[in-house]
A protein has these predicted regions:
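Glycine-rich phosphate-binding loop
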Residues: 50-88
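Amphipathic, non-transmembrane alpha-helical secondary structure
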Residues: 23, 46-53, 57, 116-119, ...
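Short, ordered loop/turn segments at secondary-structure junctions
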Residues: 12-13, 69-70, 105-108
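C-terminal binding/interaction regions
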Residues: 78, 85-134
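Short beta->alpha junction loops
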Residues: 38-46, 106
């Protein structure tokens, strides 16, 4: 059986959350026998698509996982960032025909909520790359 190889893109705007998410995703991948061949850190969720594109272009990558937290502020900026980023991430997954596990929390989430859900979002993003055939 061929080993699945993935790349991870992590938005590091909230370093404490990002570190926890990355560690959890790497542990989940290891538990499932998945090899992480690339990790790309970007500043924020809006920057994820360009790093994801570079990872999906790699021939040695079968899938990818994107991680980060988009926290609500005083304006609707979090919604714009989250929705725009998610749309581009989905487009790249379809363009390269490779699954992308989406582990970006938000929008409309407090920093406390993002911290509390960091591990769950990361683990589920790794699980999401398995496309079930019916």
């Amino acid at each position: 059986m061929k080993v699945m190889k993935i790349g991870i893109v992590i938005a590091d705007f909230y370093p404490e959350i990002a570190s926890e998410m990355l560690s959890e995703a790497q542990n989940a991948a290891k538990e499932k026998g998945i090899k992480v061949v690339a990790v790309s850190k970007v500043v924020g969720a809006f920057d994820i698509p360009i790093a994801l594109k570079r990872i999906l272009e790699r021939r040695d990558v079968n899938a990818a996982v994107v991680l980060g937290a988009v926290v609500q502020g005083e304006t609707s900026h979090d919604e714009v960032v989250a929705y725009t980023s998610a749309e581009k991430i989905l487009s790249l997954s379809l363009q390269y025909n490779k699954p992308v596990g989406y582990g970006v929390s938000g929008p409309r989430m407090t920093i406390a909520q993002a911290k509390a859900r960091a591990k769950e979002f990361a683990r589920r993003a790794v699980e999401a790359i398995f496309i079930r055939q019916s």
